[in-house]
Amino acid sequence: MAPHSLKKNYRCSRSLKQFYGGGPFIVSSDGSFIACACGDVINIVDSTDSSVKSTIEGESDTLTALALSPDDKLLFSAGHSRQIRVWDLETLKCIRSWKGHEGPVMGMACHASGGLLATAGADRKVLVWDVDGGFCTHYFRGHKGVVSSILFHPDSNKNILISGSDDATVRVWDLNAKNTEKKCLAIMEKHFSAVTSIALSEDGLTLFSAGRDKVVNLWDLHDYSCKATVATYEVLEAVTTVSSGTPFASFVASLDQKKSKKKESDSQATYFITVGERGVVRIWKSEGSICLYEQKSSDITVSSDDEESKRGFTAAAMLPSDHGLLCVTADQQFFFYSVVENVEETELVLSKRLVGYNEEIADMKFLGDEEQFLAVATNLEEVRVYDVATMSCSYVLAGHKEVVLSLDTCVSSSGNVLIVTGSKDKTVRLWNATSKSCIGVGTGHNGDILAVAFAKKSFSFFVSGSGDRTLKVWSLDGISEDSEEPINLKTRSVVAAHDKDINSVAVARNDSLVCTGSEDRTASIWRLPDLVHVVTLKGHKRRIFSVEFSTVDQCVMTASGDKTVKIWAISDGSCLKTFEGHTSSVLRASFITDGTQFVSCGADGLLKLWNVNTSECIATYDQHEDKVWALAVGKKTEMIATGGGDAVINLWHDSTASDKEDDFRKEEEAILRGQELENAVLDAEYTKAIRLAFELCRPHKVFELFSGLCRKRDSDEQIVKALQGLEKEEFRLLFEYVREWNTKPKLCHIAQFVLYKTFNILPPTEIVQVKGIGELLEGLIPYSQRHFSRIDRFVRSSFLLDYTLGEMSVIDPETVETEYPKDEKKKEKDVIAAMEQDTDELKQETPSRKRKSQKSKGKSNKKRLIAEAQGSVIAV
């Protein structure tokens, strides 16, 4: 068999991060994206795969309200700081902002024209703003509580605004009224608790208001009277109406026909949907207040009574066209309901689930032979199964009473995908992932079940390790994988394996051995099925977090809190290799590439790729901001998944082959471009050559080209032409190159010349827009000042030399006159005079004793000069 090629690099292909932290959200008009508040940032999330398309950074202000313009080009936000901001979704920049309320803004609505924005505040006020000008156009007061719901009437002829408040009232405001007393058209008082949501019928004639008093009131907007009150017997958080002409409307009409037993549905009927604390979707008919549909059970999984606060929906919205219904849960999940036509009937099903926040990731494993799904155990009582392609939550396995700590997966002989989970409730559960049901429950442990593992060959058992220090083998014989009710699992054998908690278990690929790693800093190997002790692996200085058998060799790998990974011989328990490189505890390690390599992750947030034979760390990846607790490796695809305390799930793909192809392609392209550059230089096409040199990132070649241009007669025109063809990014590179050239005296003249021409071409407004220009100029200024001072000294010295040579009659005065104009000679004399004046001042400041010594030196020099002159005369 041909050996597998070693992997050299992995790339993070997909990430699932927190994109919604509860609070406000808004759906685009076409349903393609959702703007979600996540702390002080706004995430624009693709509704198909939960990927974050863009992020709008806030200003450390917790967001309380969001709204979109009708054309989805502008996003409005407000927070606790009372600042209202308008964002351009194309540039992600704040185009204007203002303050108006005396308290946080709790709700927002944009007019159909896009020119007006209504805000509802905790200060009991309702304000209307001009979007372009940012000034207040209407000011409404009257509510006696926090105003939380607000909407414009869709009919522009009516020009009214509707608001709902915690004072249990709904008010209708006239935007055309000039008299203050006539601004409030109606006060609708039928609720006995806070109004949480308001909605309008499609014809705009009926208003629906839902409240925490467990009723929905229907209001006639002709006379503002209450047409009906619908008792729902649950605290309501949202009410929305069903639009006609959609598959959802057809589904509701068919329900109406079955309920009323009529051949045709009532065309005049209005249908509305309510959601609330029970976590079920209910569809109502306004005429007669009839409940046409109610979910049999909630899709929100809450296993304990203490978690009732997480049950229920907090908001709902009808999506455009055939996208269905969107409901938001209290635990930051988005449920997408759609209509599905079956053979017997049409049903409302949960088609998609986007999880806004996963909490801490404890464990994860790939599902099935094709590894299209990923089972994830978070800091919850449930296991979430994600579609790897879209990273949307396909389904949830709920049944444990406390947090799930560990899991493992396998494919049974019948082809069903099985999942085993261990929890803090001291039980293990066996799940059929195909039917999404629990088929077995195992009890008997007296501590948290920290590790579970399936058999690798026969799939007839699984093992579990617990905080009670025992290792158990559970039998799967006789278990029906299609059972509707879970049965009690039985143990084959049990042993007190360690002196402290068992953190990890692993089964050998031939099902003959099982290895355990413990808090007592040792790992033990046991013979199956009777759990006879084989050998103890001693050598780690801290607790062991992970153990795994090699797929090809008779060895086992352990990862420990002492920052090392060790490989041990099974035969005698000796340590074969020790791998060091992590800066903190190593939490997981797993073999890849048929045991010739392995990956490890740790509390330092790093993922490392190792070669076993060379003990070399090939690559290190930093994509987590907290401990990486979970590591899953695909057996078929060898795709890697990591999850950590930062609630982030990263998917990694082997990019060795693609990187090699990219490097070859880049090298080939660089050769071709390099030849093109040389041809351009030979043809004296300097503009093209400089452009190519920038593209190839060759600063030395750029310098040679500019240096050659400076020696040309038409250098000014050529350099200006070359600089005008550069882009903004290339100008940034040019400034970087000039900064480096400017530090060297031999290159500074060209650097200063290019810099001078660049400043003449680029206006200051464009120079400021160059990325990092401030730092670049800071590096240019000191050396430029130094070069200027040096050249200035040379110029001054040259004038002194000319004067001296002229006085000594070395230079013909007439030549000096012709070479230097009168003004230049005047400058020269001024310089000499200034220097003589400086010399006189220096003499005056010198102590008398030094002046005497200078005079004596002057006399001796004069005598020496006289003697030399006499000697020369005698010689003549």
UniProtKB/Swiss-Prot annotation:
A motif (Nuclear localization signal) lies at residues 848-855. PROSITE patterns: WD_REPEATS_1, WD_REPEATS_2, WD_REPEATS_REGION. Disruption phenotype: Defective embryo arrested at preglobular stage characterized by aberrant cell division planes leading to an abnormal cell patterning; longitudinal division planes of the proembryo are frequently replaced by transverse divisions and less frequently by oblique divisions. Altered embryo patterning genes expression patterns. Preferentially expressed in dividing cells in a variety of tissues and meristematic regions. SUPFAM superfamilies: Quinoprotein alcohol dehydrogenase-like, WD40 repeat-like. GO terms for cellular component: nucleolus; small-subunit processome. Pfam families: Utp13, WD40. PANTHER family: TRANSDUCIN BETA-LIKE 3, TRANSDUCIN BETA-LIKE PROTEIN 3. This is Protein TORMOZ EMBRYO DEFECTIVE. It comes from Arabidopsis thaliana. The gene is TOZ.
